[in-house]
């Protein structure tokens, strides 16, 4: 029986987000730096496109629907002088994100402001356009609209509002459902690499769910789409830094294999979070964590190996044992 415990005891600490402005020298350019828009200025423009930014009244309604139905005292004090229709940014979000609603049907949305010429906007537009948008391998967060404001060199990515709480309040999921979630993570990686896109920030914190069995990648601030054969990235920084980048003083020789390493770490962290230590799954990650990136499998090879592995694991209906 393979030793299924070793990766959980040796996972590197998960550092905080570095943001796009700390990638390489190209990310120092304004086009790929983080946008901090004055949201009230774009309120009318977004309304014309059918989207409404959250107001004080929206926040109050959220609290009224909570378990105790009461609006917290700190919120009332903070917004004591505000009108109900004043904008109400979520203090837990960075300045480039804002919650809102699609006016046609009440769908809750997340809006992200980016530079019009940013790599992130180009990647999102590519992944969210037909035929890629409709490809079943594509597990990018559903994008409802892309609003461009050319005079300000800014764009708004309008996404469905999913949850970063990967395990629902109702409790843990079965092993079969856990495998289904992991497969979506692997499949989207294979899909991106097929189209010469490296995500470059694969981690649990960049994974969301709609609690309907769907999981999606977010945060393409560091992502790159490669047209040629030269793919090295100098001064590479990300959430999960592979060993070759540390050995090369931050240079990333193969972004695609860096994604593979980060995906292995995501899988092991997900196992720990969900309470599953499956020896077959641990074995799957071993080659993904090879120190030499050239020795790591491709995303498509990982997906194929995963699909062959799942039928060999018994009792997919079982629940995790946290004891």
Task: Set out the residue ranges of the language-model regions.
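Juxta-kinase regulatory segment immediately upstream of eukaryotic protein kinase catalytic domains
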Residues: 2-91
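Regulatory extensions appended to serine/threonine kinase catalytic cores
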Residues: 22, 316-323
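ATP-binding glycine-rich loop module of kinase domains
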Residues: 59-146
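Conserved structural core of kinase catalytic domains
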Residues: 135-182
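Catalytic-loop of the protein kinase fold
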Residues: 189-212, 217
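C-lobe/activation-segment region of protein kinase-like
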Residues: 211-283
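Short C-terminal capping segment of an alpha-helix within the protein kinase catalytic domain
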Residues: 285-292
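Terminal C-lobe "cap" of eukaryotic-type protein kinase domains
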Residues: 292-295, 301-315
